[in-house]
Amino acid sequence: MVTKMKKLFVLLTSTLLFACSSGPSLDQLAAQMPKDNRSVLLQVPEAGNPVSNGMLVATIRTAGGTSGKRLVSLLATDNLHIGIAGNSQSVNKAVAMYGLNNAEKVGKDVSLYLVGDSQSDKTDLEKAAKAKNVEMHYIMQK
C-alpha cells in the first residue's frame, strides 16, 4: 500500500504544475473543481499560434504527447478529479480525447473537468467519457 501511495505521489507531483495561471480558464476551472486532496490539475502547454497549435493537435491525436500520456496514467487512478487547463481549447480537447480513447484501465470514481465554449466539443467529450465510465464536467466559458 505504501509503495502504491509513493508511486501515486510521484505521478501526481510530476504531473502538476503549480506555476502561474494560464489564463481565466484555469481560475474558472479551479473554482468548479472539488476542494479536496483528490483534485489535480494537468496544465497543457500550447504552441503559441493557431497554425502550430493545429500541428500540435494532429500530433496529440496520433501519438498523445507528454500531456496525453500523463492523462492516460491519471485516468487509471481511483477517486480522482482531473482538471485539464491550458491556453488552447483545441489542444486541451485533443489531450482529453487522447486520454479517454487510449486509457486501457480507468479507475473508479474518476471525473474530468475542462473549460471551453464549444457545444460540439462538450458533446464529443461527454460521449467519450461516458464510454469509459468517467464523469465529464465541461464548464461553458462566459
Protein language model features and the residues they cover:
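N-terminal secretory signal peptides that target proteins for export/translocation
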Residues: M1-K4
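Bacterial signal peptide processing site
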Residues: S21-P24
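Post-signal peptide N-terminal segment of mature Sec-exported envelope proteins
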Residues: Q28-N49
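C-terminal partner/receptor-binding element of secreted or periplasmic proteins
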Residues: V115-K142
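C-terminal motif of bacterial Sec signal peptides marking the signal peptidase cleavage site
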Residues: L16-A19
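Sec-dependent signal peptide recognition
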Residues: K6-L11
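Structural motif
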Residues: Q43-G48, G83-S90, L114-S118, M140-K142
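Mature extracytoplasmic domains of secretory-pathway proteins
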Residues: S52-S111
